[in-house]
Amino acid sequence: MGKIHNGQLLARLDLTTITGEPVQIPDPDHLVHLQFRRFAGCPICNLHLRSITRRHDEIVAAGIREVVVFHSTVAAMQPYQGDLPFATVADPDRRLYVRFGVDTSPWAVLHPRTWIAALRGVATGKAAPPGRGESALGLPADFLIGTDGRVLAHKYGHHADDQWSVDDLLHLAHRRSYPTS
């Protein structure tokens, strides 16, 4: 399947988190910030998710539900994402990645900005090399999905540290705009 675009109406997804909780996208009561990350031990991803965790109350107050997908198994994700206060979903077969057009690229790890973020992430202790079936070449992607299933905004990352910040997300949710990248 190709890339998702703003204004596109998504079919309903029924997912299960790594803790066994059901997640429905779209959520009839909340905007959904659907994030695609790399592998469970990714230092850049885990550093980014800690920033989401620190400001999770603000995100919830803005009417947004976080749903984060990794191309890892539940077992691989538990040590790294098991304590997060939002939904995390294992997609080791990358079915959701294909459905949403989320790619891989050597540039994911070659861009200089990724090196600094990776070092900062390793320093937090929440990092490990890719495990069996995982890849360091995954690119991140972000989607803001309305209660009706319409894509309000999206971003396909060009390298491993190219994703929306919390400020970006809150701004987009407030404006309900349609930027592309």
Set out the residue ranges of the language-model regions.
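Short loop/turn microsegments at loop-to-beta-strand junctions
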Residues: L10-A11, H33, L139-A141
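Structural microenvironment flanking redox-active thiols in thiol-disulfide oxidoreductases
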Residues: H48-R99
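A short, polar/charged loop-to-alpha-helix boundary motif
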Residues: A160-R175
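Short beta-strand/turn micro-motifs composed of small residues
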Residues: R37, F70, G146
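Short active-site neighborhood of thiol/selenol oxidoreductases, capturing the structured segment around
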Residues: Q24-T53, E66
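Thiol/selenol-based redox catalytic cores and closely related redox-interacting motifs
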Residues: D91-D161
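Cysteine/selenocysteine-centered motifs that mediate thiol-based redox chemistry or coordinate metal-sulfur cofactors
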Residues: P179-S181
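N-terminal "domain-start" segment that seeds a small globular fold
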Residues: M1-I25, S51
